[in-house]
Structures are given as C-alpha cells and as structure tokens.
From Swiss-Prot:
CDD domains: Cu-Zn_Superoxide_Dismutase
Keyword annotations of the record: Antioxidant, Copper, Disulfide bond, Metal-binding, Oxidoreductase, Periplasm, Signal, Zinc
Record Gene3D superfamilies: Superoxide dismutase, copper/zinc binding domain (2.60.40.200)
E.C. code: 1.15.1.1
Quaternary structure note: Homodimer.
Taxonomy of the source species: Bacteria, Pseudomonadati, Pseudomonadota, Gammaproteobacteria, Legionellales
Pfam families membership: Sod_Cu (PF00080)
Organism: Legionella pneumophila subsp. pneumophila (strain Philadelphia 1 / ATCC 33152 / DSM 7513)
Descriptive protein name: Superoxide dismutase [Cu-Zn]
SS bond list: 73-158
Subcellular location(s) per record: Periplasm
Cofactor binding note: Binds 1 copper ion per subunit.
Positions with a binding annotation for Cu cation: 66, 68, 83, 137
Gene of this entry: sodC
Amino acid sequence: MNKSGIILIGTILFSSMAIADDLTAPIYTTGPKPVAIGKVTFTQTPYGVLITPDLTNLPEGPHGFHLHKTADCGNHGMHAEGHYDPQNTNSHQGPYGNGHLGDLPVLYVTSNGKAMIPTLAPRLKLSDMHNLAVMIHANGDTYSDNPPQGGGGDRIACGVIK
C-alpha cells in the first residue's frame, strides 16, 4: 500500500472516531402539532460536554435547559418525566453545583428567535446521555429548589438524544 492509501485510511478512521464523540437531539415544539425547530449537538471534551444549539423560532431571552430522564417528548413534553438525577440528589443546584445532573447552562435566545451560543456542562459525560430527553422551558432558571425546579415553567420544546 502506498503512502497516500495509508493516509486515506487513517483519515477515515479518525473521522469515524470523531463522529462517535457526538450525540444529537432533533428539537421539536411540544404543542399538539410538533414542529421541527433545529437540533442540539453534544460533544465530549476533556472539560465536560460541549452543548451546541442550532435552534430557531424560540421566544427571546433566557430559557431553562435540562436533561430529562425519559427519552419521550410526548404529551407536551410531560412523558420525559423529571430531571435526570442518577444519584438521587433531589436537588436543583445548576450545572456547576452538586445537585442533579439534568441542569444544563441556560439557553439564550436572541431577538431573532435563534439559539446558537455553545455552552459547557462540566459534570456530564457523553456516555451518560444516551436515551435521555433535552428540554427547553418557557422561562429562565434560578438553579434552586424555590420556585420548584428553578422556575423554568412550561416545556416548550423537546428532543430525544441519539
């Protein structure tokens, strides 16, 4: 095999390994007729999971952004159940606290309805995220238990992580 053949095989192998380090969730509105609004990509880094939204048609401002324990967005997002909490902390302390792992950094939506600002969830591992739901709430997030679940409010968009 010549040198260019070896380089080509190495490139293909490296590319497939890089692809394996991403998970994607197509995101849909949670209304009676769900509409596709984009996707969220999750990438493992040495510092945690990089979360890269590519979303449109959302209300401007900060939104609660969480992992939910069941990979089902049915019934207006209610089938996704509660926040992902594998250690049963029952505590909402944000992505940098010691509470449940379902807290993601707040999702910011610009005045044109787009969310594209990447964030980092330092306590998460990509291997923990298979078959979970990612949820976007109507309101911002206080990262506390008062109001309940940080005050995120209604579930306005949801996707299953694949």
